[in-house]
Amino acid sequence: MIENNKEITLDIIKLLPKAELHRHLDGSIRISTLLELAKEQNVELPTYDQNELAKLIHKDENCSGLVNFLEAFQYTCSVLQHAYAITRVFYEMCEDAVADGVSYLEIRFSPVLHTSFGLSLSEVMEAVCDGMAIAELNLPIKARIIVCGLRHLDPSISKDLAEITWRYRHKGAIAFDLAGPEDGFSSKHHKEAFSIIRNKGINCTLHSGEDSNWTSVADSIHHCGAHRIGHGIAIQQNEELLNHVVNRRIPIECCITSNYQIKAISNASEHPIRKYFDSGAIVSICCDNCTMSNITLSGEYKLAIDTFNFKVEEVIRLIDYSFASSFIDPPLKINIRRESFKKALKIFQTNGYDISGVIENKFYYFEEIGLDVELEIQNNLANNFSLGKNVIRNYPQITLELLENLPKSDLHCRFDGGVSIEQIWNEVQLLGIDKCEKSKQEFLKKLSSKHLACYANFKDFKEFKSLIQSSSHTPQTIRLSKEIINLLLQTPEQINRAFDDIIKVALKDKVQYLELMIRPNSHSRNGLTKEQVLALIIENKDKWEKSSSIKIGLVVFSSSTSDDPIETLDSARLAIANRNSGVIGFGIFGADPISPTESRHFSQTFSLLKENNFNLVQFAGKSDVESLISTIHCSGSTRLSGAFQSHKIPRLMSYLGNYSIPVEISLTEKLKSFTSDDLSFTTPIRHLLDGKCPVVICSFRSSLYPYSRSKMYYKIVKNAKLDFKQVVRLLKNPFAYNFQSHQQRIELVQQFNKLSKEYLNSVNINYSNIII
């Protein structure tokens, strides 16, 4: 019998599959093992009575604060100076975790704390790797290792530990952490360590906002590239930072009991986990130090459930958040998530709990782990190879008509490159350039060089179209076309007409969401200031959003070719100043990306964007991989444009996929030119898709090409041999990976689903298990 509001008991919680992401080796040793090892190694302890020793080690009663909490580590570390002891404790931690229902465990420790008796860092690492291997051979658990640097030690030590993390990446070391006191020991001091971490694409989590303020967390994210935040209590001090963590999907490792015991909060109910969860943040319930806190992960779930009134569906989501936030490889992660979800749901269902909330939130589970909750319940939550059961066997043929009628989003439409050829010709006619040779020559004098004017031979619309949309564009003709279009977009009237044309064409292409890229400096030849240009664009955006179904985001951009660092900084300030008027990001584009050596000249711009948690998209990876790495980690880009060379390093492609870093791409001459080596066995777009990179197809400068968005998609689909399911994913990506807030992205994806189903139903196309 199903009971509403039935108590979620500790026994039930123990049965649930769980992942633990924040557990310290030297803080989770059994008291009995501590005693045995001390006797074996002749280590002096204050007492050898197990009960009395437990009173010293456990901090669940009368802990006066962090200093008192840390005192116990002197005893645990003293017996962990020999390889066999380290191996044993790692194994026993896994054993204890399994007894508590934990099926995935990340154990963190600092190897440097285990070298007092002569072990090298490598010997310490071999010892934990042995413990992990033995555990996985004998226990139903997956375990991994996180190596900790220490803030208060010399940065050179952290550098060595970062290097050892990289060297043991294939033996189970999956991430680097920075632990230790925050105040007075900024993570910025350890830049050499994080340079290694970033350049090698190593996962990264930092203890931040535990015993310090929100700036420590901001430093961890913006300067160190943290993929997760350990503790993060201080995030609540800054709403803008919290929104950034939510929107960037940066998980927070929440250690409720530990935070209470060190007096970071006065009681468990003051922990911000519920606030974070309700704000849309990804939170993971963790133990920190099981022995010192005298807790289990099941107990921490029980504490959170009872204190913050988490319901069945929320508990299942908390469980999934932890598995989703793990640093394990993506193919294994997604399958662990699916099986853990099914197991948890079945436990609640068979024990009489109301699971209607899970069905109500089926959108989350379908989009996140690809499971149709209702279908899984119908199939009795089969655990073995159930994914794909009842899925369409015969996908519909992908036709141009199908693509024309499905909803789309475009995340990179250039204002001076997205105007239709008809509207551009209209501006030519309004200036009389088509009728008067003198007017034409006066117009062409405004081009940047006389050499370019030599190519501008057109007498009528047909010749003009052949010039602007040449089937054999060269760098010269592309440059000429861009300059001609730009010269025709200099007055308020021209800007207004161009905006109207761009939106009308987008609506015709069934575009529901558009990110319009605008470089205000490009439209100031006739005396308009960049502020006036942007004000015109914002006014037009507001007008169209009120009068039509389209939603528009504005991205101010700078040219790495034409703008110097001072002009780029000025444009970034303009973008941020208008963030409440629809400007949602900043971009840097050009003929060539900013190289790693040049990026320091733009450091003020990058720092400003980071300080304001402002989205950045940047052109990178044209002909080198280095610019991709510096663009992600030094510039702080949340989206990449181009990324033509990412396929050369499979680990980099995996990184883009694992951290959902979207790649803007289109059928441009640049794509063909800089990915020619990739075409021998696949297409560049298919290569990125198969690597699980969130590819977003964009129109860029559609004025230069004679096909609509739908025709561009059709070419891509045919060249890459995509099936219906892959096409749906490709179309959905820009709805899910744009610069809007997390909640708005959810709403956009739901809009895509709704409109897609309406059309597919009208033509009797089955979309089971593809769209929900």
Swiss-Prot record:
Native organism taxonomy: Eukaryota, Amoebozoa, Evosea, Eumycetozoa, Dictyostelia
Protein name from the UniProt record: Probable adenosine deaminase
Binding site for substrate: 24, 26, 180
Residues that bind Zn(2+): 22, 24, 207, 288
Enzyme class: hydrolase
GO BP field: adenine catabolic process; adenosine catabolic process; hypoxanthine salvage; inosine biosynthetic process; negative regulation of adenosine receptor signaling pathway; nucleotide metabolic process
Catalytic activity: adenosine + H2O + H(+) = inosine + NH4(+)
Keywords for this protein: Hydrolase, Metal-binding, Nucleotide metabolism, Zinc
Residues making up the signal peptide according to the UniProt record: none
